[in-house]
Amino acid sequence: MWDLADPDQTHDGGLWAIAHELGHVNQIVPGLKWVSTAEVTNNVYSICLQYKYHPDEPLLETSQSDDGNGESIPGGCFNHFLTSGVVEGKLWPLQEDAFVKLCPLWQLMLYYRMAPTASWYKPDWYGDVAEIVRNTDETGMSHGQLQLNFMRNVCDVVGEDLTEFFSKVGMLKPINERIDDYGYTWLTITQDECDELKKYASQYPKPISPVVYYLTANSLEAFEKQLPVKGMYGAG
């Protein structure tokens, strides 16, 4: 607790924990706290604060963590997310690790909030989504509908069709699972509901980058400035 109570220690060890708990206060129920997100959407605040004060040590990209194959490596969370989520297609709500589940939300934060010279810069997008949720009566909606609403709200706020991104990270896919998130609750999304959201979002242009789901803090400059890819195919 010392690093939380001492201002001189807070920047080094207490930032995440403080923002984590305040993040719980800002988890608007139910629209920003549907099943599987109890320890995820609150950490959006933690990851942003940690990056603000330690941009050279982004937590998800540098922390020693499980890579999904039983190996503990720096940046293991992102490796786990990219392998199981993007490549293998695992459903996002079924990711067991809350930090792995945080990765795509962090990617959206990086793309829209942390790239100030980009034409798509919308630093307040998450706050705008929260404001929509705050002023919308979502009482009685299923958890699947809440997840769909979140994706719809993000598309509305940024003015772009992010359905390909949400599909690749495992959020916009059919699911019918009983999930344990401080108690068991069903999360159901049908193929028809996925198709309906894709049709709705098609009114917006696609993001300039078609591969936001590969973005990390390490590649932010390349995305922001749309730099050409360097290296040799198959060699790196």
What are these regions (language model features)?
Residues G76-N149, C155, M171:
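Non-catalytic carbohydrate-binding regions of carbohydrate-active enzymes
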Residues M1-L110:
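Catalytic cores of extracellular degradative/oxidative enzymes
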Residues S36, V40, S119-G127, E164:
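Short, solvent-exposed positions on alpha-helices
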Residues E21-H24, Y53-H54, Y121-W125, D161-L162:
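Loop/turn elements at helix/coil->beta-strand transitions in domains of secreted/extracellular proteins
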